[in-house]
Amino acid sequence: MRGDVESAGYLNLGYSSDRIENVLWRIYHGELDGYQAEKIVVMIGTNNLGIHSAEEIVDGLEFLLKQIQIRQPKAKIKVAGLFPRKGMESDVKKLNKQISKMAARNGCDYIDVGKKLLAKSGKIDEKLFVDGQRLNDKGDAVIVGSGLLD
């Protein structure tokens, strides 16, 4: 996915196993300084599942968005909902509704690309995941083609 993101004109600042607090630390240490972004896609929080409550995740994302807006005030920000996880599909769906409302409240667009990773049953499409949590190449292709980078 990294190559697709970069060829679409985005700088990919994501790291495997990142949580919201890791992104905040990097922002505090200059990751968004020294350039003017036109568009920013925020796709973080899945690794906070099981560690933090839904309220803490939404609050953390909201705080992160405000920090991004301070440092990149002209950028158009799109927030991606969390991807579903095996056994947590309904919890993620509820959480994404809260994230959508929070994004709108903060003047950000929202996209739920995770719903494209579900089978008709509402459970994850196992063919798109390595382990029920991490996407395989087919899952990455679904995300890249979802409108996330438009």
Where are these regions (language model features)?
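Surface-exposed aromatic
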Residues: I44, V79-F83, I124-L128
